[in-house]
Amino acid sequence: MNRLPSSASALACSAHALNLIEKRTLNHEEMKALNREVIDYFKEHVNPGFLEYRKSVTAGGDYGAVEWQAGSLNTLVDTQGQEFIDCLGGFGIFNVGHRNPVVVSAVQNQLAKQPLHSQELLDPLRAMLAKTLAALAPGKLKYSFFCNSGTESVEAALKLAKAYQSPRGKFTFIATSGAFHGKSLGALSATAKSTFRRPFMPLLPGFRHVPFGNIDAMSMAFSEGKKTGDEIAAVILEPIQGEGGVILPPQGYLTEVRKLCDEFGALMILDEVQTGMGRTGKMFACEHENVQPDILCLAKALGGGVMPIGATIATEEVFSVLFDNPFLHTTTFGGNPLACAAALATINVLLEQNLPAQAEQKGDTLLDGFRQLAREYPNLVHDARGKGMLMAIEFVDNETGYRFASEMFRQRVLVAGTLNNAKTTRIEPPLTLTIELCEQVLKSARNALAAMQVSVEEV
């Protein structure tokens, strides 16, 4: 039987939620009630699959942990008052920490004036953010399109490349195995994992996937396209594959891809949604090789962990295809004043506090520690790798990776696997993580592996 809509029920539910939003603290009974509600609502109205996922990576009934607030720049607090060191960083959102006061203040000040733009008049913060990114981005990147997520920034990049290259008779994209560019239809066509792709087949035509880091395979794809008349419009890739398991290509790979793009008249699209904004020790990961893309995709940390925002930055030559009709590709909320305020404040914090350099230094400390643990527990850990504060520990199998995440949760450190590689646990903390907390994370990882080793020996 169909359930009849109930405005009274919706009103009561929204009022209850608003009451919770107003509260800074909850008593014990309120916490227990909220946990029960959240679990029930996820099961009945969000997606029960999320609960099953939480059960698979936790133990002892901890799957129902409900986050409540930020504890500090680098920690989260759940409804039970337990504080967790955040080594997941919302998959790369919290580069400047949780509730960074500079970012929060900028958003609050803008909120007091004008939360959203009129859509008709010229909005100043969108102009100022575009100018700031043009000054910050490498090479000739000059014009920015703003959206709300990384997937949207990739969609915009693909459409820009199509609009630029279609008149030139070039329609095919090269992406790479292990790639993750998002899950909307266009971005998913570039993403490489069959689990995400298969239910939505057929995807957009015109995408080839070659092995990541293999410049010979990339060169062959270009040559074959030339021979068959199916010329390459653009290459899209991540400088470091995040969801693929934090996979670093050989040194010089990006440089060689850039050369191929220049040789064959293709555009180079770099997806820095996860690697950008200081994460790898440079503001943008492509700067490690001084490579200049034609189109650059940003999101995640651009909003400072306070507002969602994505950006697609392109050279004037490429972006000019939108000059005659700027309404060819737009979005209602993209570049809104609150999001732009957050992004401007985030860039200011990253530069003022030199957080990219801090990411390099602290990342070296953490990675050295993880590599030492890999040497001590070779039957559990296959590899530890990364750059800056984007790291991964690869385990011998999926189950071991899940067990490590569970043990770290017991140690009150939040980590998780990557979407394209379940054996790999991602370590992606805020760039503001202190040296003391870095040491605590390494201690917790040692304790977790020791507990896992005992379990293995008892079997």
From Swiss-Prot:
Gene this protein is translated from: patA
Record carries keyword Amino-acid biosynthesis: no
Modification N6-(pyridoxal phosphate)lysine occurs at: 300
Organism per entry: Salmonella paratyphi B (strain ATCC BAA-1250 / SPB7)
Listed SUPFAM superfamilies: PLP-dependent transferases (SSF53383)
Broad class of enzyme this protein falls into: transferase
Catalytic reactions on record: an alkane-alpha,omega-diamine + 2-oxoglutarate = an omega-aminoaldehyde + L-glutamate; putrescine + 2-oxoglutarate = 1-pyrroline + L-glutamate + H2O; cadaverine + 2-oxoglutarate = 5-aminopentanal + L-glutamate
A Gene Ontology molecular function term of the record: putrescine--2-oxoglutarate transaminase activity
The protein's name in its UniProt record: Putrescine aminotransferase
Keyword Glycoprotein listed: no
Pathway: Amine and polyamine degradation; putrescine degradation; 4-aminobutanal from putrescine (transaminase route): step 1/1
Entry-linked Pfam families: Aminotran_3
UniProt keyword list: Aminotransferase, Pyridoxal phosphate, Transferase
Role played: Catalyzes the aminotransferase reaction from putrescine to 2-oxoglutarate, leading to glutamate and 4-aminobutanal, which spontaneously cyclizes to form 1-pyrroline. This is the first step in one of two pathways for putrescine degradation, where putrescine is converted into 4-aminobutanoate (gamma-aminobutyrate or GABA) via 4-aminobutanal. Also functions as a cadaverine transaminase in a a L-lysine degradation pathway to succinate that proceeds via cadaverine, glutarate and L-2-hydroxyglutarate.
Cofactor annotation: pyridoxal 5'-phosphate
One GO process term, biological-process aspect: L-lysine catabolic process
Entry's EC annotation: 2.6.1.82, 2.6.1.29
Family to which this protein belongs: Belongs to the class-III pyridoxal-phosphate-dependent aminotransferase family. Putrescine aminotransferase subfamily.
Binding sites annotated in the UniProt record for pyridoxal 5'-phosphate: 150-151, 274, 332
